[in-house]
Amino acid sequence: MTSRRLASATASVLLTLTLCPAGAAAHGLAGKRFFPSALTIDDPFVSDELSLPTFFHIRQPGDAESPPGQITNVSGEWSKRIFPDLGLTLAGDWTLLDPAPNGRTESGLGNLEMTLKYQFFTSAAHETILSAAFGWEAGGTGRKKIGAESFDVFKPAILFGTGFGDLPEPLAWVKPLAVTGLIEGVLPGRSGNKTFSLSDDGDLEIEVEKNPNVLHWGFAVMYSLPYLQSFVKDVGLPAIIRQLIPIVEIDINNPLDRGFAGKTTGTVNPGIIWAGKHFQLGLEAILPINERTGKNVGIRGQVHFFLDDIFPNTLGKPLFKW
């Protein structure tokens, strides 16, 4: 795409955003609270939605096993409600490693993922959502050279979201705050991978790479300017600004066993979301929490569509009712 066409497309998108009214008819609602879709951690609500694309880029320092390089990832995720409170999500991604651990530039698709989520509690008065999910990463469906594992991974999780809108009036300026989060087990279907090779003397050598169980947890703190304008006080923000939701996400992985216990990795992800009626745009920085995670700042961006608002009577409604 030429720079002129890119500028024209960008201007068209910005014009659409400015004219697009606020709010959401069904997506991520608990009472007056609209929960936007977070970019890094999973959301607690069940809805019809499409994240396409989600873009990720970061430079990685080298280590004993791989040279320094950069990772670029583009992913998509489609969620569909089977029943009003039960949904299924399908996700896939494409990764570019420059270079890969083998010293060459490698690219390819990652493993396919499927998640079943049940939103079992919703409180309109307290702007609270609770849900349970079970994810399955189908081993062997992605390219091994970009890091796709050959074994299945299972991911049971509890997710939550709550707004502060029920606080007393003296704390009115805190009411736009909301928190979402999850606690998830990442359970590999195989405890280790065996690699067979021959030594210089012709002896058979067996190398075992352990796959630990991991406690994955995280949360997002967001301040909703749409909530401030609509339910606290109209402070006269310009139309495009009043749809912004500043957000900070924390994403942590704690390996639990098989020689990896205590080797925590994670990121802090500050950013901004623009939420319209039919879609949202998000952009975040990626800040590693320690040297084990990395040393460089990355970037993540996302275009997210609210299918339940775009197609409320067809593609965006549950397949069945209870």
What kind of region is each of these model predictions?
Residues M1-A11:
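Bacterial N-terminal signal peptides that target proteins for export
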